[in-house]
C-alpha cells in the first residue's frame, strides 16, 4: 500500500476523530461507520488515514517499569490498515550515543519485520525477551524489553576525521634559520649557517611535501640538500605515499634499524593512517553499568570518588578516560532517584601503549622502491662505496590482550631482514620491552629493557641492554652496552627529604663507563617563592684514560612574576668554580625570557682555561619569527654566538600571512581587518590565541578537527562586535590552510552632549548611528555604541530633514567622552520644539 501525505482537510478530520479514541466501545452508541480495533473505536476519518499509512514513533520501554518517563525514542514505524488488519510495514531505527541499545538478535527481528500483523491485543512478539506494543490512544509504539534483550552502548575506540574543510589549493611553509659564530682565542673566527624549509601544498586530502635545507648561506661554501619530495593521501583509514621518502614515511609501524643512510625512491600503502583517530585512553576492559531508569553511576577506588556520570536507561560503558592509568579495581554504584540500585566491583585496565592502543585492529603497510645507499665508513676501518639497490618490505603491528607487538620484514642489496618489537606490561608496576633483528648475512641484534615501580610508589628502577653483531653485508656497527638506574623518592618516607637518582652506563665495546648520582630537595615553598637544593656527581672513564669526575651543588630560588635565581659550585677538570645564574620570564611582549650565567674558578689549577666565563641569552616571540639569541664565553676562551629563528607562512588564493609559531603544517588565516594594534582572540578547541591587526596566520596540527570561536580579548581595551563568522568548524589535513573572514565592528562607547548650530541643547531627542539608536536626556546628553568605521550620529526632523554629528574617534578605545558636539544642519533646537514635531529615528 503506497504511503501518502495527509491533506490539511484529512489532518483536521483526524484530529477531530482522535476525540473518539478514548470512548469505550458500546454497541448502542457506536456509529455504524466506525470500526473497532484492539478494543478502541476507530472513526471513519482515522480509519481512512490508517489505510493510507502513517508513521508513529518507536520507544524502548523496560519491562516492569512504571510510566513512560524513562522511555527513549529509538526510531519510527510505518503502520497501515489492510482489510481490517493493522500491520507494521517497516521499522526505521535511529542511532544515538545517549539512547539505550538493543541486542543484535532483537535488532535483526525488528529490521526483518515486513507487513507483520498485530494480534488482537495490538502486540507483536519478537523474542522471549522483547515484544512490540501499539497504543492507539497515544498513537505510539513501544518496544517492551527485558534486561536480556538490551545491548550495551559501548564507546567508540576509533573515528575517521572525515573530509577536509578546505576545498581549494593551499600551502604551509615552515622555516628554521640558524646562524653560528665561533670567535677563537687567537682572534680568528668562523661562521656557519643553515636554513631548513618544509613546504606542504594540498588540495583537500591530497598533498605534496618538499623538505630541504640550505647550508653556508652567504659564504663561499654554500650547499643545499633535498631530503624529501613526496605525494601523500591519508584518508578514511588508509594511507598512500610515493616519491623520495625517508624511512619514517616509508613505514612507521615496526622497527627498521638495518637500513643505512641514503635516499629511497618508492611507494607505501597501508592502513596505518592518521586520518583515523584511535582512543587508547579508555580501559581495555570496558566498565559496564546497567540502569533500569535514568540515573547516575559513581566510580570509587579505595574510598575515594573518581567519577560521577549520568546515563539514561540501559547498559552503558562508563567513560574511563579521566581515570588514572594502571590495573586496579573500582566500585561501580548505580544510583536512581537518590537510591543505590546496585553496587559491584569491576576491573580497570589502563596501560600506556605504543601505536593504536589495546583492542585496535591489525595495522599493516607494504612498501618498496629503489634505494640509493650512501658511502659508509666505520671508524676508518670498514668502508663501503655508494650503491644502488632495490628495497621491498612489509610491516604490521597489533595487540593481544595487554601484549603490544610490531614486526617488519624487508630486503635490499640481496639481504633479507626481519625485526620485531614486543611490549608487555606485567601488572601495573612492571613493563618489559624487547626488540630483535635478524638478517641473512648472520647479523643479529637484541635490545631489552625493563622498568618497574616498586611497592609503595616511592621508587622506580630501569635496566637496558643492547647487543649487536653485524655480518659482512649490513652497514651497521657492533654494539654491546648496558645501563641501569633508578629513582628513590625519599619524600614519601619523610616530608623533609627529597629525590635521589642514580644511573650506570657500561659500553663494553669501547670499554667506557659513566656514573651519575643526583639529589634534589625542596627546602622552602611559600608566599615569597620556593627554594630548592641540587647536588650531584658524575664520573666518566673512556678506555685506558684516567677517570674524569665532576661534582656540583646549587641552590635554586624561584620568585613570583617569573623570576629565577641559582647559585652553586662545580668541581671538574681539577678545579672548582662558583656559578651564578638568573632568569626572568615575561607573559607579554616580543622578549619572553632573558637569562645570564657567570662562573669563576675559586680553587685548583685551571691550566690554560680562563678563570672567568659566562653568557647571556634571550628568547623572543615576534609576529613573524620566534627563537633564541645566545652569547657564551667558555672557559677555553672561545666566544660562541648563535641565533635560531623559526616560523611559518600560510597561503590560500589571494590570502597569505606569516606567523612565528610552528605548531603544525596546517593552519588558519584570519582576515579580521582590525586597524592599527587592534586585538581579538581565537578560541580553538578550548585554547586561547591572540589575533592582532588586519591579518593573522595560526599554524595547527594536521589530521585534526577544530572548533574555532572569535571573541573579544581580555587584554585589550577595545570592544568589538563580531557580526558574522564568529564560529567555525574545521577539519584540516597537511597543507590545508583555511581562511576565516569575519565581519568585525570595532565598538566605542561614546558619551557627550549634543547641540544645534546656535548652541541650544537637543533635549529628549531620538538620535541614530550606523548600528543603533538612543534618546538624549533633558540636558542633551547621550551614551551610545558607535562603529569606528562609521563615526557619525544623525538626527531627523521635519519629515525628511537631517542634521549630522561627525565624531573624531581615530584614537578612541573602549569608552570616550566627546564633550559638546554640534549637529550640523540644524540651526536651532527651539525651532523644532516650537513646531511640536515628533522627531523620528
UniProtKB/Swiss-Prot annotation:
Keywords associated with the record: Fimbrium biogenesis, Signal, Transport
Signal peptide coordinates: 1-29
Induction, per UniProt: Negatively regulated by H-NS. Positively regulated by IHF and EcpR.
A Pfam entry, by short name: TcfC
Keyword presence, Signal: yes
Keyword Transport: yes
Role of this protein: Part of the ecpRABCDE operon, which encodes the E.coli common pilus (ECP). ECP is found in both commensal and pathogenic strains and plays a dual role in early-stage biofilm development and host cell recognition.
Miscellaneous remark of the record: Not expressed under classical laboratory conditions, but is functional when constitutively expressed.
Homology family: Belongs to the EcpC/MatD family.
Protein name per UniProt: Probable outer membrane usher protein EcpC
Organism: Escherichia coli (strain K12)
Amino acid at each position: 500500500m503506497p504511503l501518502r501525505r495527509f491533506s490539511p482537510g484529512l489532518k483536521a478530520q483526524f484530529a477531530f476523530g482522535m476525540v473518539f479514541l478514548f470512548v469505550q466501545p458500546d454497541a448502542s452508541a457506536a456509529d455504524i461507520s466506525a470500526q473497532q480495533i484492539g478494543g478502541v473505536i476507530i472513526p471513519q476519518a482515522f480509519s481512512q488515514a490508517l489505510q493510507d499509512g502513517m508513521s508513529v514513533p518507536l520507544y524502548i520501554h523496560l519491562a516492569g517499569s512504571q510510566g513512560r518517563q524513562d522511555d527513549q525514542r529509538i526510531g519510527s514505524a510505518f503502520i497501515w490498515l489492510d482489510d481490517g488488519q493493522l500491520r507494521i510495514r517497516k521499522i526505521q531505527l535511529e542511532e544515538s550515543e545517549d539512547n539505550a541499545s538493543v541486542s543484535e538478535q532483537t535488532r535483526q527481528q525488528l529490521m526483518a519485520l515486513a507487513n507483520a500483523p498485530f494480534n488482537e491485543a495490538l502486540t507483536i512478539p519478537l523474542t522471549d525477551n522483547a515484544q512490540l506494543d501499539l497504543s492507539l490512544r497515544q498513537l505510539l509504539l513501544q518496544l517492551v524489553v527485558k534486561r536480556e534483550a538490551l545491548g550495551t552502548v559501548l564507546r567508540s575506540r576509533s573515528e575517521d576525521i572525515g573530509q577536509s574543510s578546505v576545498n581549494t589549493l593551499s600551502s604551509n611553509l615552515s622555516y628554521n634559520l640558524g646562524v653560528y659564530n665561533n670567535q677563537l682565542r687567537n682572534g680568528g673566527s668562523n661562521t656557519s649557517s643553515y636554513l631548513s624549509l618544509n613546504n606542504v601544498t594540498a588540495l583537500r586530502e591530497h598533498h605534496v611535501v618538499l623538505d630541504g635545507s640550505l647550508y653556508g648561506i652567504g659564504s663561499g661554501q654554500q650547499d643545499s640538500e633535498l631530503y624529501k619530495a613526496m605525494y601523500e593521501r591519508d584518508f578514511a583509514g588508509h594511507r598512500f605515499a610515493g616519491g623520495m621518502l625517508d624511512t619514517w614515511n616509508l613505514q612507521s609501524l615496526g622497527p627498521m634499524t638495518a637500513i643505512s643512510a641514503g635516499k629511497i625512491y618508492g611507494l607505501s600503502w597501508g592502513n596505518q593512517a592518521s586520518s583515523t583517530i584511535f582512543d587508547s585512553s579508555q580501559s581495555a576492559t570496558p566498565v559496564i553499568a546497567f540502569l533500569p531508569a535514568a540515573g547516575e553511576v559513581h566510580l570509587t577506588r579505595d574510598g575515594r570518588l573518581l567519577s560521577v556520570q549520568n546515563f539514561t536507561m540501559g547498559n552503558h560503558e562508563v567513560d574511563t578516560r579521566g581515570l588514572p592509568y594502571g590495573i586496579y579495581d573500582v566500585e561501580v554504584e548505580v544510583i536512581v532517584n537518590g537510591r543505590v540500585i546496585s553496587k559491584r566491583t569491576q576491573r580497570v585496565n589502563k596501560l600506556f601503549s605504543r601505536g593504536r592502543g589495546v583492542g585496535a585492529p591489525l595495522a599493516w603497510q607494504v612498501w618498496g622502491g629503489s634505494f640509493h645507499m650512501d658511502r659508509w665508513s666505520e671508524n676508518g676501518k670498514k668502508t663501503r662505496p655508494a650503491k644502488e639497490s632495490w628495497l621491498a618490505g612489509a610491516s604490521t603491528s597489533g595487540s593481544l590482550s595487554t601484549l603490544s607487538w610490531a614486526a617488519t620484514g624487508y630486503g635490499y642489496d640481496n639481504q633479507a631482514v626481519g625485526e620485531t618489537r614486543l611490549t608487555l606490561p606485567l601488572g601495573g608496576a612492571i613493563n618489559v620491552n624487547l626488540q630483535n633483528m635478524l638478517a641473512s648475512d648472520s647479523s643479529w641484534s637484541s635490545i631489552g629493557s625493563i622498568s618497574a615501580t616498586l611497592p609503595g610508589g616511592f621508587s622506580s628502577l630501569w635496566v637496558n641492554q643492547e647487543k649487536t653483531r653485524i655480518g659482512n653485508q649490513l652497514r651497521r656497527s657492533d654494539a654491546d652496552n648496558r645501563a641501569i638506574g633508578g629513582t628513590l623518592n625519599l619524600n614519601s618516607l619523610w616530608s623533609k627529604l627529597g629525590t635521589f637518582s642514580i644511573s650506570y652506563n657500561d659500553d663494553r665495546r669501547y670499554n667506557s663507563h659513566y656514573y651519575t648520582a643526583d639529589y634534589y630537595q625542596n627546602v622552602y615553598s611559600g608566599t615569597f617563592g620556593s627554594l630548592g637544593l641540587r647536588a650531584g656527581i658524575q664520573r666518566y672513564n673512556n678506555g685506558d684514560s684516567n677517570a674524569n669526575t665532576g661534582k656540583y651543588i646549587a641552590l635554586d630560588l624561584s620568585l613570583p612574576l617569573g623570576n629565577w635565581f641559582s647559585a652553586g659550585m662545580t668541581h671538574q677538570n681539577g678545579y672548582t668554580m662558583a656559578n651564578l645564574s638568573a632568569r626572568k620570564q615575561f607573559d607579554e611582549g616580543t622578549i619572553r625570557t632573558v637569562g645570564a650565567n657567570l662562573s669563576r674558578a675559586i680553587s685548583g689549577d685551571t691550566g690554560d682555561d680562563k678563570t672567568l666565563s659566562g653568557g647571556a641569552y634571550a628568547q623572543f616571540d615576534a609576529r613573524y619569527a620566534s627563537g633564541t639569541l645566545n652569547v657564551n664565553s667558555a672557559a677555553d676562551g672561545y666566544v660562541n654566538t648563535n641565533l635560531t629563528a623559526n616560523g611559518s607562512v600560510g597561503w590560500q588564493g589571494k590570502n597569505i600571512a606569516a606567523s612565528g609559531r610552528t605548531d603544525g603544517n596546517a593552519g588558519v588565516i584570519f582576515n579580521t581587518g582590525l586597524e592599527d594594534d587592534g586585538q581579538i582572540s581565537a578560541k580553538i578547541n578550548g585554547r586561547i590565541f591572540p589575533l592582532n591587526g588586519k591579518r593573522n596566520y595560526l599554524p595547527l596540527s594536521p589530521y585534526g578537527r577544530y572548533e574555532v570561536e572569535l571573541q573579544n580579548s581580555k587584554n585589550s581595551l577595545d570592544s568589538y562586535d563580531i557580526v558574522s563568522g564568529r564560529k567555525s568548524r574545521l577539519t584540516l589535513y597537511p597543507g590545508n590552510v583555511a581562511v576565516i573572514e569575519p565581519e568585525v565592528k570595532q565598538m566605542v562607547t561614546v558619551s557627550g552632549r549634543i547641540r544645534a548650530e546656535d548652541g541650544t541643547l537637543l533635549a529628549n531627542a531620538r538620535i541614530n548611528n550606523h548600528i543603533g539608536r538612543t534618546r538624549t536626556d533633558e540636558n542633551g546628553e547621550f551614551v551610545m555604541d558607535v562603529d569606528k568605521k562609521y563615526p557619525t550620529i544623525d538626527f531627523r526632523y521635519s519629515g525628511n530633514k537631517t542634521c549630522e554629528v561627525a565624531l573624531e574617534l581615530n584614537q578612541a578605545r573602549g569608552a570616550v567622552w566627546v564633550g559638546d558636539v554640534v549637529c550640523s544642519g540644524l540651526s536651532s533646537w527651539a525651532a523644532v520644539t516650537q513646531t511640536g514635531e515628533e522627531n523620528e529615528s
